[in-house]
Design a protein with these regions (language model features):
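N-terminal nicking endonuclease/strand-transfer module with a His-rich metal-binding environment
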Residues: 1-295
Length: 295
């Protein structure tokens, strides 16, 4: 088993998509590409990917339009470039799964993570949830001498909030004016991710901005907390909550692989330097013996 100098940590990354760019994420998540941005995808492993929920239409946008037509969600008042989808990528480093049973354990873990997503966003608002099991971890594979895969979950969700529609002042019945006419499920990224948890100092005093208004905890950081507490309550142990202030939640798949490759290269360079230190004295001794032989 490979050495593990780093703590196993959970991570939840959040990405925003509009109507014009969600198809790129769909092609990656649903494995519709002929080639992939992430060059570590092993196409023979694609059948091992696990869908906990599949879209009920051919595309994500078609499903959203169908849900709007059925009155399940509202796009009322949104701009053409508004955020319509959130992609939640849930992840724990590779060796956590390798030590706990590999593929089968990862399926159990991410099925429970999918239920967390259902509770957080509402089951009807989850368009797709799929565990990728086809992306090879090159560094772990080389270290262990066998193929090791990086298991993670992609969930595409709709950021929905309940919005009250009021009767207008032009309503003929004066008693109805200003009262609630209907409650709709409005797509709104900004409202869905609005944080109301204040930041405090060590003494518990609220931290204020320059204008005197309170500062609030980042909503993505709160998501990290919620995920960690939910998963540990479901019996999954042996990992920590992702580091506070970490930018890992914003990394794309390609950026993640580049970061991993950099770490792998640094380790390789250190090994080379270590071998060179051993080689130089041996080379010097060999040279000296050759000089003696030639005398």
């Amino acid at each position: 088993m490979a050495k593990n100098n780093k703590a196993d940590m959970s991570c939840a990354r959040v990405k925003k998509y509009t109507a014009s760019d969600v198809s790129k994420a769909e092609r990656h998540n649903e494995r519709k590409n002929e080639t992939y941005e992430n060059m570590n995808v092993i196409e023979e492993r694609i059948p091992y990917n696990v869908h906990f929920k599949k879209p009920f239409t051919p595309t994500y946008m078609e499903q959203l339009k169908q849900m709007e037509a059925d009155g399940m969600v509202s796009l009322r008042g949104l701009r053409k470039d508004a955020t319509l989808f959130n992609e939640i990528v849930i992840d724990v480093n590779t060796m956590y799964f390798e030590r706990n049973g590999g593929y089968e354990y990862a399926k159990q873990f991410y099925e429970e993570a999918y239920h967390f997503i259902e509770e957080k966003f509402g089951a009807d608002n989850v368009i797709s949830a799929v565990m990728h099991a086809d992306e090879i971890n090159v560094a772990a594979t080389e270290e262990l001498g066998k193929e090791v895969y990086h298991y993670h979950l992609h969930a595409m969700v709709l950021p929905v909030v309940e919005k009250e529609i009021l009767w207008s002042k032009r309503c003929k019945d004066p008693e109805l004016r200003g009262t609630v006419k209907a409650v709709v499920n409005q797509i709104s990224h900004s409202k869905k991710w609005k944080s109301d948890i204040p930041l405090t100092d060590e003494k518990g005093n609220p931290l204020l901005r320059k204008n005197g208004k309170p500062m609030f905890r980042a909503s993505y950081s709160i998501l990290q907390d919620e995920l960690f507490h939910y998963m540990t309550e479901q019996g999954f142990k042996g990992f920590q909550r992702g580091e506070y202030g970490s930018t890992a939640e914003h990394l794309t798949s390609l950026q993640y692989q580049i970061q991993q490759d950099k770490e792998r290269l640094e380790k390789l360079q250190k090994r080379i330097q270590k071998e060179q230190v051993k080689y130089e004295p041996a080379r010097h001794i060999s040279k000296t013996l050759n000089e003696i032989d030639s005398m």
